[in-house]
UniProtKB/Swiss-Prot annotation:
Pathway: Porphyrin-containing compound metabolism; protoporphyrin-IX biosynthesis; coproporphyrinogen-III from 5-aminolevulinate: step 3/4. The keyword Cytoplasm does not apply. It comes from Chlorobaculum tepidum (strain ATCC 49652 / DSM 12025 / NBRC 103806 / TLS). The lineage of its organism: Bacteria, Pseudomonadati, Chlorobiota, Chlorobiia, Chlorobiales. This is Uroporphyrinogen-III synthase. SUPFAM superfamilies: HemD-like.
Amino acid sequence: MKTVLVTRPKHQAEPFVRELAQYGLDSVVFPTIEIRPVTGWSVPDLTRFAGIFFTSPNSVQFFLERLLEESPDELPNLQQARVWAVGKTTGGDLEKHGVSIEPLPKSADAVSLMSGIDASEIEGKTFLFVRGSLSLGTIPEVIAKRGGICVELTVYDNIQPSLEETQKIKSLLTEGKIDCLSFTSPSTAINFFEAIDSKEVPSDVLIAAIGTTTSSALEKLGVKVDIIPEYFDGPNFAKAIAAALS
């Protein structure tokens, strides 16, 4: 049985482990990021924005938790707003709360999302970007270049956990007991290679990235990426890994 290293946050690892198991793959869970809610922010008046951007399920979760707890009157405004999402899971989480979203980009990344929005829809308008502490600056950069204003609201922190099991993971790699390393964000990749204090892995270990943003981060580290799914979500990621390991 082939074994995949899963670097997702602990609370998000289990569904992916199940998806891998459907293909007869074993998993070793080694979370290299930890997600924590940010305190000290309030839900703004959503009617002042021409549109709202969410790029991860975490951004939806923490924003809606605060909104429903402290500003439930803003839910109808969110439901009536133009809302963009990156990824099927992010979009699906919004739709569960009655929020209609703009068509999803073909590729689940911010670059594809912004390329599908005409400049005339942005110029002179103000937008809200609900983000994590390590979210990339693609959306605010594009909005600014097109003459719009982007208000950024950080609702969760993305931090490096203690990684006590680093030595165990290094041993498993050395002993040939891991066949694939899977990364679902730039920070999972960066933190992993910082933890093992090396950019080198055994040549027969495949490197899998869930999308182009994560793949680019790995390439900047000097790590060759072997697997990218056709669509950037968990089920397709597991399918692509299984195909490569078969």
